[in-house]
């Protein structure tokens, strides 16, 4: 096991998996540290089998035999604003006895090769961004999918978000939820608009996973819908922004109750492409 930057790399089943250090119980000595950590990871990892977090073996117990690949239908609302959309999301059906008949879109942030050199419209109505971020306030066009940040040890954010997305997928399937994996591998050719449109059509809510800090554990928070009046009056934001914020508050509340560090008040206002095009409860959650 390697520990640093507020999270750890657990080696198991021939692979390496990134886990928040808060889930790993420290061993009494360096000699037994790796074994102890593998015994004391969170209940999430305990439910996985030897394949490790997000591995195929751990998933098979709760997934349907034939996951369904789903591409973007250009006739869907807002699909015409997408510039990168040749990739496919993957829909997993839960086989748990307590099926909820609800689908959660799990969006592993970043991971679109070439996404940083393509621009898409920030808002459906062409208005400029009202907050800063990857794209500056006042811009009408944004990067289709940014490359994300790099952790202090050189690991790309996209790699870590995918590992966490697979862990979340397995937990949701075990709890009876179907899961639309927006990105199920290292690269998916779906820009942020395409990801939102797919979630709008095939899911009941949309959760995008990200990290925001590099050298320390900043804490968890979600990107809330800006309080700017003109932004909140724009569709589809006007009809859905309260649902977006409620979902974010619920997720941060759950993370807080589980003992995770929360940054500031748990939210930060941000004008995102994701929520600008979302018609289901949708949130970008930063996990540290």
List each model region and its residues.
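SH3/SH3-like beta-barrel superfamily modules
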Residues: 1-23
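Catalytic-site microenvironment of enzymes
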Residues: 24, 28-288
């Amino acid at each position: 096991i390697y520990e640093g930057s507020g999270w750890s790399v657990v080696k198991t089943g021939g692979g390496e998996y990134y886990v928040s250090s808060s889930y790993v119980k420290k061993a009494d000595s360096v000699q037994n540290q790796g074994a102890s950590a593998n015994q004391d990871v969170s209940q999430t990892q305990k439910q996985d089998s030897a394949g490790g977090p997000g591995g195929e073996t751990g998933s098979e117990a709760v997934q349907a035999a034939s996951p369904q690949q789903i591409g973007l239908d250009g006739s869907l609302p807002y699909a015409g604003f997408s510039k990168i959309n040749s990739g496919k999301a993957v829909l997993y059906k839960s086989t748990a006895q307590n099926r909820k008949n609800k689908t959660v879109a799990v969006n592993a942030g970043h991971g679109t090769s070439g996404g940083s050199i393509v621009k898409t419209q920030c808002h459906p109505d062409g208005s400029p961004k009202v907050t800063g971020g990857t794209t500056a306030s006042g811009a009408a066009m944004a990067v289709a999918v940014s490359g994300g940040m790099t952790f202090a040890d050189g690991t790309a954010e996209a790699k870590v978000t995918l590992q966490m997305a697979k862990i979340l997928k397995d937990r949701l399937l075990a709890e009876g939820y179907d899961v639309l994996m927006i990105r199920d591998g290292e690269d998916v050719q779906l820009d942020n608009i395409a990801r939102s449109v797919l979630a709008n059509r095939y899911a009941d809510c949309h959760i995008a996973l990200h990290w925001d800090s590099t050298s320390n554990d900043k804490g968890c928070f979600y990107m809330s819908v800006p309080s700017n009046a003109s932004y909140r009056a724009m569709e589809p934001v006007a009809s859905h922004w309260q649902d977006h914020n409620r979902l974010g508050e619920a997720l941060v509340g759950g993370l807080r109750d589980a003992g995770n560090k929360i940054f500031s008040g748990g939210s930060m206002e941000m004008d995102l492409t994701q929520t600008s095009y979302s018609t289901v409860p949708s949130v970008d959650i930063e996990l540290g």
